[in-house]
Amino acid sequence: MINNSNDIGFIQDIAGLDKLRQKAVNGDENAGQSALTAAARQFESIFTSMMLKSMRDANSDFKSDLMSSQNEDLYRQMLDEQMASEFSSSGSLGLADMIVAQLSTGQTASEQKGEDGFQEAMRRVEHARKTASERSNEDLVAAVYPLRKTQAVQSTQFDSRHSFVTKLKPYADKAARMLGVDSSLLIAQAALETGWGQKMVKNARGNSNNLFNIKADRSWQGDKVATQTLEYHNNVPVVEKAAFRSYASFDESFNDYVRFLENNPRYTNALDHGGNSERFIHGIHRAGYATDPQYADKVLRVKAQIDQMNLYKSPAGIFRRHSFSSSIFSAYQS
């Protein structure tokens, strides 16, 4: 099997394809062989993507107008393309091996061996098709919000939504007191951004602990990780590459979230209405925190789910806002 060190990454990474072309044209013999291997894997991923598309088209007549939408079709297409890339990256089908063997200088193969290899590849393709058809729609949502270049990291820290809430609650409570907002709202925002902790951005150590998907701008001096993300421009979803902040702990993530809001004047109006969850989340949304036109409503729906867990008994408005620099973290009755 070919070496998988040449990560083909995200299937729509055009810049990566251009680098591959330059390597093939300008590199030495070893670089050319490496480029051939990567190109073979790209071809395999395209073939697999076409196979998955044909499978989806065959089932299009069974779709329900009530349960389907254009956004769902877009997300499913993006998921299928990324699945095709991952199949090729792991060498699941074997087509790339055959291409490299046929095109590499000095390598020959008997016709019988080629025929056997083709039949084996077709068996692997059929297995991949069955695997893809069994993927649930829940995987689709988790794979694209947020969309990641790195393969999804299944967190071992949260084995359920209840676990996600209970483990983050102490950090959220502290941050909520500093901002003067509802603690469950912060957890809801983190749940939406990370798929309940199952889809956080991956760095060299594992999860980046970035619960709020705050990007690493020029002012950020800490660790960062590059990834693909789904942004909206004029209500149209677009895949972009961006750098995100990386933290050593969840506590750091919550603390930086507080600093991020308090140090940006555009969020001042939203912070002035922290006692009202709807006005606060809609306020930071309008100020540019997220580009998804439905972002605030999605956060509020997740918050309603968390509130039903009965983990929050404090009355509304129990917290007053404190500056991040303040060392007072006690709650005051309003």
UniProtKB/Swiss-Prot annotation:
GO terms for biological process: bacterial-type flagellum assembly; bacterial-type flagellum-dependent cell motility; cell wall organization. It is an enzyme of class 3 (hydrolase). The keyword Cytoplasm does not apply. GO terms for cellular component: periplasmic space. The active site is at E231, D256. Residues 160-334 are annotated as: Catalytic. Its EC number is 3.2.1.-. GO terms for molecular function: amidase activity; hydrolase activity, acting on glycosyl bonds. It is found in: Periplasm. It holds the Pfam family Rod-binding. Keywords: Bacterial flagellum biogenesis, Cell wall biogenesis/degradation, Glycosidase, Hydrolase, Periplasm. NCBIfam families: flagell_FlgJ. Flagellum-specific muramidase which hydrolyzes the peptidoglycan layer to assemble the rod structure in the periplasmic space. Probably exported via the flagellum-specific export pathway. In the N-terminal section; belongs to the FlgJ family. In the C-terminal section; belongs to the glycosyl hydrolase 73 family. This is Peptidoglycan hydrolase FlgJ. It comes from Vibrio cholerae serotype O1 (strain ATCC 39315 / El Tor Inaba N16961).
